[in-house]
Amino acid sequence: MGTSLLCWVVLGFLGTDHTGAGVSQSPRYKVTKRGQDVTLRCDPISSHATLYWYQQALGQGPEFLTYFNYEAQPDKSGLPSDRFSAERPEGSISTLTIQRTEQRDSAMYRCASSL
């Protein structure tokens, strides 16, 4: 199971960057000062029920943050602190918000979707 999940995640990331269709994220890049709030948006493939958020620090592999099945958030165990929150209110577009950003929040944030 671990190998197939890893392959799926890699394909999910390829889909966000290298194809013109599929999952889209905005803003593409965000630079902020410490202490400011940041909200990232993910628009998954329209027929996909499940949406995942990952954090990838420089030189590290992706770390799971949370996922949604439609608007339900069954697992948010990966969200690093109470400053991180995610929502998907209508089962489509999702947002990831980081409040009062800190230096250690510096990373690439990715979303992926699946059936």
Curated annotation (Swiss-Prot):
Its main location: membrane. InterPro entries: Ig-like_dom (IPR007110), Ig-like_dom_sf (IPR036179), Ig-like_fold (IPR013783), Ig_V-set (IPR013106), TCR_beta_variable (IPR050413). Disulfide bonds join 42-111. One of its GO terms (cellular component) is plasma membrane. The keyword Membrane applies. V region of the variable domain of T cell receptor (TR) beta chain that participates in the antigen recognition. Alpha-beta T cell receptors are antigen specific receptors which are essential to the immune response and are present on the cell surface of T lymphocytes. Recognize peptide-major histocompatibility (MH) (pMH) complexes that are displayed by antigen presenting cells (APC), a prerequisite for efficient T cell adaptive immunity against pathogens. Coiled coil: none annotated. GO terms for biological process: adaptive immune response; cell surface receptor signaling pathway. The lineage of its organism: Eukaryota, Metazoa, Chordata, Craniata, Vertebrata. Residues 1-21 form the signal peptide. It comes from the Eukaryota. Keywords: Adaptive immunity, Cell membrane, Disulfide bond, Immunity, Immunoglobulin domain, Membrane, Receptor, Signal, T cell receptor. It is found in: Cell membrane. SUPFAM superfamilies: Immunoglobulin (SSF48726). Residues 22-115 form the Ig-like domain. Alpha-beta TR is a heterodimer composed of an alpha and beta chain; disulfide-linked. The alpha-beta TR is associated with the transmembrane signaling CD3 coreceptor proteins to form the TR-CD3 (TcR or TCR). The assembly of alpha-beta TR heterodimers with CD3 occurs in the endoplasmic reticulum where a single alpha-beta TR heterodimer associates with one CD3D-CD3E heterodimer, one CD3G-CD3E heterodimer and one CD247 homodimer forming a stable octameric structure. CD3D-CD3E and CD3G-CD3E heterodimers preferentially associate with TR alpha and TR beta chains, respectively. This is T cell receptor beta variable 7-7.
